[in-house]
Swiss-Prot record:
Protein name: Bifunctional protein GlmU
Organism from which the protein derives: Afipia carboxidovorans (strain ATCC 49405 / DSM 1227 / KCTC 32145 / OM5)
GO biological process terms held by the UniProt record: cell morphogenesis; cell wall organization; lipid A biosynthetic process; peptidoglycan biosynthetic process; regulation of cell shape; UDP-N-acetylglucosamine biosynthetic process
Pfam assignment, any one: NTP_transf_3
Cofactor note: Binds 1 Mg(2+) ion per subunit.
The encoding gene: glmU
Binding site for Mg(2+): 108, 230
């Protein structure tokens, strides 16, 4: 933590053409969150911290995503793409507004952590005007090299301009930078475009700061944290890294992952104590899982609240709007959606529970379907506490099943069932003794060869 004020500037104006997608690059997702969201939620968010996002002229969706997550964020448009420094100066108004520290980060680096933002700020001490985030690359080819003398960064050399000796340097530029607020705008406004592309490069700030008698420094982080996303392949690589991070955090918090590499979590998944997740489970966004819950193999859960000691699966699908109370049992091939199941409810086999409220200790038999859609609108089903719904029943919504009532197997329920009543809605069984034997004999006679 620091008592200095900050302005975090997120550069999110890139086209992302190599993604081969109509969606803006920073809105692609890692662990159930957009690339941009992962960056914004890692950025400083204290009372003294401000946030600005630079977007492209046709990227209203990017601005909307940023405001959804950080409503206080200022938006700036980079009308022409003329380099990284040009993008930063698109937010000149925000920079001029003043802050002790200016933090610049790309919106396509979803693995960056809050700790790294804090370390960048902490390194802005004394006459250090710029701090650059670096990493040791396994293969530095293509990266800008950070050239250091002692504790001072003297230059960022791009691959094409590097000497043979400089190309052997494995300390590379991650793209994330911090500026001392008092000198930031002066340095940025001195960056020119005298290069082959006619663009304004943020990396030129190092030389300008040194010409002003100021120092630049480097802090290092792991290569995985600063992965930039430009292709779908890189998106998949970032997902792999993020999932490994989330699994490790979950296990360190006491969650049992039987086969961690087969479980997929979301960045916002929350766990209680003694949760067990079996192999091949997918947890989508917006899920909380309380103490002692067990999610069995091949289950999918998203935007739902899972209560204490709940058992789910195997092969269950828990869809958005589901709330499962303590001790609820959801068995194999059960699907729930927009449903509240109070404590002790059992839905053990082959059922659909949608747009419903199921009271405490009710039992929903195998093959029960809540028929919630009439082709135009969704309707709700209410099942009272302690009700027993027999196997292969259809509850045609809107309908209310009274507390303590019994529904006979195979029934189609279209009207309200009173409390403690028995309802059986099916044709009376007809038994014809000897019919099957006579039928087989007749069929066998018909199949005999004709002479």
């Amino acid at each position: 933590m620091t008592d200095r004020s900050s302005l975090t500037l997120v550069l999110a104006a890139g086209e992302g053409t190599r993604m081969r997608s109509s969606r803006p690059k920073v809105l692609h997702e890692v662990a159930g969150r957009s690339l941009l969201a992962n960056v914004l939620l890692a950025a400083p968010a204290g009372k003294q911290d401000r946030l600005a996002v630079v977007v492209g002229p046709d990227h209203q969706a990017v601005a909307d995503e940023a405001r959804k997550l950080r409503p206080e964020a200022q938006m700036f448009v980079q009308s022409e793409r003329k380099g990284t420094a040009h993008a930063v100066l698109a937010a000149r108004e925000a920079i001029a507004g003043g802050a002790d520290d200016l933090l610049v980060v790309f919106g396509d680096t979803p693995l960056v952590t809050a700790e790294t933002f804090a370390r960048l700020q902490a390194a802005l001490t004394g006459d250090v005007a710029i701090v650059v985030l670096g990493f040791r690359a396994k293969d530095p080819a293509g990266y800008g090299r950070l050239l250091v003398q002692g504790n001072e960064l003297i230059a960022i050399r791009e691959q094409a301009d590097a000497s043979e000796a400089e190309r052997k340097v494995d300390l590379c530029n991650a793209g994330m930078m911090a500026f001392a607020g008092k000198s930031a705008l002066t340095i940025l406004e001195r960056i020119g475009n005298a290069n082959s592309k006619g663009e304004y490069y943020l990396t030129d700030a190092i030389g300008i700061a040194r010409e002003m008698g100021l120092r630049a420094a480097v802090i290092e982080t792991d290569e995985d944290e600063v992965r930039g996303i430009n292709t779908k392949a890189q998106l998949a690589e970032a997902e792999t890294v993020m999932q490994a991070r989330l699994r490790r955090q979950a296990m360190e918090a006491g969650v049992t992952l039987v086969a961690p590499e087969t479980v997929f979590l979301s960045a916002d998944t929350t766990f209680g104590r003694d949760v067990v997740i079996e192999p091949f489970v997918v947890i989508g966004p917006g899920v909380s899982i309380d103490d002692g819950a067990v999610i069995h193999s091949f289950s999918h859960v998203t935007q739902s609240s899972i209560g204490k000691k709940v058992s789910i699966g195997p092969y269950a699908r828990i869809r958005p709007g589901t709330s499962l109370g303590e001790g609820v049992r959801i068995g194999n091939f059960v699907e729930t959606k927009a449903a509240v199941l109070e404590s002790g409810v059992k839905v053990n086999h082959l059922s659909y529970v949608g747009d419903a409220h199921v009271g405490t200790n009710a039992n929903i038999g195998a093959g029960t379907i809540m028929c919630n859609y009439d082709g135009f609108d969704k309707h709700r089903t209410e099942v009272g506490a302690g009700a027993f719904v027999g196997s292969n029943s259809s509850l045609v919504a809107p309908v209310k099943i009274g507390a303590g009532s019994y529904i006979g197997s195979g029934s189609v329920i279209t009207r309200e069932v009173p409390e403690d009543a028995l309802v059986v809605e099916r044709n009376e069984q007809v038994t014809r003794p000897g019919w099957a034997k006579r039928y087989r004999e007749r069929k066998a006679e018909m199949k005999k060869p004709k002479t």
